[in-house]
Regions:
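Catalytic tyrosine of NAD(P)H-dependent dehydrogenase/reductases that use a Tyr as the general acid/base
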Residues: 103, 130, 168
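Short, contiguous, well-ordered secondary-structure segments
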Residues: 81-83, 106-107, 114, 132, ...
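GNAT-family acyltransferases
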Residues: 1-99, 116, 120, 159-180
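Conserved catalytic-core motifs of GNAT/GCN5-like acyltransferases
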Residues: 13, 127-129, 147-163
Length: 180
């Protein structure tokens, strides 16, 4: 199972990905708005890779796409889709290594995943949320076509404090953005 873009390959995780996964998920800035607390150990990354190996992108539950930079053949991030039991709704999340941010890779990967979700899987609605302080993620979601639908005040207890969450939605009829 592969998705390809101009610069990326999105694929299943492999055992060899565990060290890179542990490294970028251990980064303090990467973990800042995420539910995990660094370090993201190698053992935890290995467990994650094993869990993902048993999942299918078209089945209910979370499936994480490993994002590989084609030119360097290195893991640079991941994009997750949580498909609801009804197979018509999904949630989206993404995490990228610090060295590969700000270069359009996350946007490219998220667009590829959304295209598959809407055109192959026939999902009607994709939802996403991010910490209100995570301006880069909010901008990315809006750039790929999501509509900011709201703000939940003090909705998540994260690392010792209450945080606000921004809520986003994207409907199949709005995909791809700018289509007639």
């Amino acid at each position: 199972m592969l998705l390809t873009t101009e610069r990326l390959v999105l694929r299943r995780f492999r055992a060899a990905d565990a060290p890179a996964l542990a490294a970028y998920r251990s980064d303090e800035e990467t973990a800042r708005y995420q539910s995990w607390v660094p370090p993201f150990t190698l053992a935890r990354a290995e467990d994650f890779v094993v869990q993902m190996a048993g999942r299918e992108p078209d089945a209910p539950g979370w499936f994480q796409w490993a994002v590989e930079l084609t030119s360097q053949r290195v893991l640079i991030g991941d994009v997750g889709v949580g498909l609801h039991d009804n197979l018509m709704q999904a949630d989206l999340g993404f995490t990228f290594a610090p060295a590969y941010r700000g270069q359009g890779y996350a946007t490219e990967a998220v667009r590829a995943v959304l295209d598959r979700v809407f055109t192959v899987q026939g999902v009607r609605r994709v939802s996403a949320e991010c910490d209100a302080r995570n301006e880069a993620s909010a901008r990315l979601l809006e750039r790929v076509g999501f509509t900011r639908e709201g703000r939940q005040r003090s909705s998540t207890w994260l690392k010792g404090e209450w945080t606000d969450d921004l809520l986003f939605g994207l409907l199949s009829e709005d995909w791809p953005p700018g289509a007639p």
